[in-house]
């Protein structure tokens, strides 16, 4: 990529109501401890060193009570004295939406300000429409694979597509999800305020010609496509992901600048629809953000077998849109020496060099906050730090705007964590427990550290690292689907069973990663989780076999406990 920034165009609901779960002999260790995406277990009255003797969960009407009175979620609450709102959120993307809903559930009078459309990048120009396009590309790819169909005994005539119909599928899905988000906030009484929000001063926000006050403020303004200097975007032949998701054309030959999540996903879409793709990558290898072993396998499957070529170790120093019958012109230079390398003439170019924070015009100068490469500096609790290194009281920043982890679900988790804090619970989010996924066919997913990162950490801290692997070729369900190409890899500590990272390439990898991410979030050790039972035959057995393949010195720390369930 030409930028270090990258983004993947990427909450569990409660179970059935009126069920009571009781346990009088809970184990003293962690497997049953509940924690949201790496939030501290202390928030749920659990202690890793004390036995749970009388913890009762009563689930009714989508409400949880854990040794405390639950806050009312029936409508927006009354604000604190002297403030218009308890919480003001600037930005109604996925992060702002998650924070708003959680705030109302906690009884906070909440307002959310949006100057564009509800849903932000993820819903309107990212995760949601891209998944619609990828759903199409996946089906096209399968129908076009005569060998794959023949293995099932199926005969399929030549597959085709209607470009506008595909584009409409993506647009309609974005509209549906956007309406769902809007309606969910309205139903809970969140005040949705229209206008561009800016901080006027401590606990004071302006939107349009209006000024409101809030006890606490969250900035959740997200990001925009990053376009390097020298690249002219016309929205037709030189485009960003914002334009590509509209699928206004399917060029015969398109260059994709950057081979991260965004570039890989669009290469999957374009090649399935008939385009030839050329990757332009600044680093010496494709897919630099992934674990090297996974990258190597993914390149063999996702790139080498398709109509894709690539240039690595080069910058696109200048890109000129097509005009007057001339093609798109791309001038390449060596990434290290900056010497001219090559010139490409293509039908279109997609700039997939990552995302840049959208933080201009937020009034940060009014509170002495200086951005760092556009990102708003925050501490581990998402509290904003001013130019003097001091915390700005009652001001938080979540999501892409703070740059900690540019993923939609990370923004939502950060927003929920902040709401927990402003309602009296100290929460620190473990970002290493947050998974990421690339929705190619097959998919790539990961959580925690890559092998090089883990070995660097081990060398500094003085412990050993081991690797466990398992292949999809040994999984019955994958073979039944004729999708045996895949690998799961775990990096761990053999001395204590700590999971440092898990990386998966294969069928439904994006779904399979969550068992590992939850284990990291909960602090569950391999010697405990390897005793879990998985249904057969399922893809989840890939992860099961991965845990079982690990060799850990420490014995399991738990024994089976009987749990009485009353329905």
From Swiss-Prot:
Disulfide-linked positions: 122-127
Named cofactor requirement(s): FAD
Enzyme class of the recorded protein, top EC level: oxidoreductase
Residues where NAD(+) binds: 258-265, 281, 354
A Gene Ontology term for the protein's cellular component: chloroplast
Species classification: Eukaryota, Viridiplantae, Streptophyta, Embryophyta, Tracheophyta
Single Gene Ontology BP annotation: response to arsenic-containing substance
PANTHER family: DIHYDROLIPOYL DEHYDROGENASE 2, CHLOROPLASTIC, DISULFIDE OXIDOREDUCTASE
Molecular function terms from GO: dihydrolipoyl dehydrogenase (NADH) activity
Active site: 536
Location relative to the cell: Plastid, Chloroplast stroma
Miscellaneous notes: The active site is a redox-active disulfide bond.
Deletion phenotype: Arsenate hypersensitivity.
Key word DNA-binding present: no
Residues where FAD binds: 114-122, 131, 197, 221-223, 400, 406-409
The reaction(s) this protein catalyses: N(6)-[(R)-dihydrolipoyl]-L-lysyl-[protein] + NAD(+) = N(6)-[(R)-lipoyl]-L-lysyl-[protein] + NADH + H(+)
Binding note for cofactor: Binds 1 FAD per subunit.
Record-given protein name: Dihydrolipoyl dehydrogenase 2, chloroplastic
Gene: LPD2
Alphabetized UniProt keyword annotations: Chloroplast, Disulfide bond, FAD, Flavoprotein, NAD, Oxidoreductase, Plastid, Redox-active center, Transit peptide
Assembly with partners or alone: Homodimer. Part of the plastidial pyruvate dehydrogenase complex (PDC) containing multiple copies of three enzymatic components: pyruvate dehydrogenase (E1), dihydrolipoamide acetyltransferase (E2) and lipoamide dehydrogenase (E3).
């Amino acid at each position: 990529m030409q930028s270090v920034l990258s983004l993947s165009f990427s909450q569990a609901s409660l179970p059935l109501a009126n069920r009571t779960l009781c346990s009088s002999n809970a184990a003293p260790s962690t497997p049953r401890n509940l924690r949201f995406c790496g939030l501290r277990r202390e928030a749920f009255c659990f202690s890793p060193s004390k036995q749970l003797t009388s913890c009762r969960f009563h689930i009714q009407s989508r409400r949880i009570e854990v040794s405390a009175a639950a806050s009312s979620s029936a409508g927006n609450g009354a604000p604190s004295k002297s403030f218009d709102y308890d919480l003001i959120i600037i930005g109604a993307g996925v992060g702002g939406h998650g924070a708003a809903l959680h705030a109302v559930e906690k009884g906070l009078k909440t307002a959310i300000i949006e100057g564009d459309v509800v849903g932000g990048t993820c819903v309107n120009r990212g995760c949601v429409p891209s998944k619609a396009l990828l759903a199409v590309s996946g089906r096209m790819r399968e129908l076009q694979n005569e060998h794959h169909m023949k293995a099932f005994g199926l005969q399929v005539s030549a597959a085709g597509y209607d470009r506008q119909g595909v584009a409409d599928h993506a647009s309609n899905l974005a509209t549906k999800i956007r309406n769902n988000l809007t309606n969910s906030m309205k139903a809970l009484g969140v005040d949705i305020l229209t206008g561009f929000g800016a901080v006027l001063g401590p606990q004071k926000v302006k939107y349009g010609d209006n000024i409101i006050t809030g006890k606490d403020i969250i900035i959740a303004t997200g990001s925009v496509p990053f376009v390097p200097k020298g690249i002219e975007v016309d929205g037709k032949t030189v485009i960003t992901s914002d334009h590509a998701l509209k699928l206004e054309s399917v060029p015969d030959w398109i260059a994709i600048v950057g081979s991260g999540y965004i570039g890989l996903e669009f290469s999957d879409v374009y090649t399935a629809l008939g385009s030839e793709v050329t990757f332009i990558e600044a680093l010496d290898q494709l897919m630099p953000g992934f674990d090297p072993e996974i990258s190597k396998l993914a390149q063999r499957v996702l790139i080498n077998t398709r109509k894709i070529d690539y240039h690595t170790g080069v910058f696109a120093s200048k890109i000129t849109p097509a005009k007057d019958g001339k093609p798109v012109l791309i001038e390449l230079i060596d990434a290290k020496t900056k010497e001219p390398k090559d010139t490409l003439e293509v039908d279109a170019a997609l700039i997939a060099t990552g995302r840049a924070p959208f933080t201009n015009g937020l009034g940060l100068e009014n509170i002495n906050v200086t951005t760092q490469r556009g990102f708003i500096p925050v501490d581990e609790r998402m509290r904003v730090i001013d130019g003097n290194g001091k915390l700005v009281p009652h001001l938080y920043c979540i999501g892409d705007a703070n740059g900690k982890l540019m993923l939609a679900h990370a923004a939502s988790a950060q927003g929920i964590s902040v709401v927990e804090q402003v309602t009296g619970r100290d929460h620190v989010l473990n970002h290493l427990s947050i998974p990421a996924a690339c929705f190619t066919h097959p998919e790539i997913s990961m959580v925690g550290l890559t092998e090089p990162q883990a070995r660097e950490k081990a060398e500094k801290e003085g412990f050993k690292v081991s690797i466990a692997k398992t292949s999809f070729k040994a999984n019955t369900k994958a073979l039944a689907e004729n999708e045996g190409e895949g690998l799961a890899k775990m990096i761990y500590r053999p001395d204590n069973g700590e999971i440092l990272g898990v990386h998966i390439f294969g069928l439904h990898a994006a779904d399979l990663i969550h068992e590992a991410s939850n284990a990291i979030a909960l602090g569950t050790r391999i010697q405990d989780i390897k005793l879990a039972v998985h249904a057969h035959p399922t893809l989840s057995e890939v992860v099961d076999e991965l845990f079982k393949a690990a060799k850990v010195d420490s014995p399991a720390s738990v024994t089976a406990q009987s749990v009485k369930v009353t329905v």
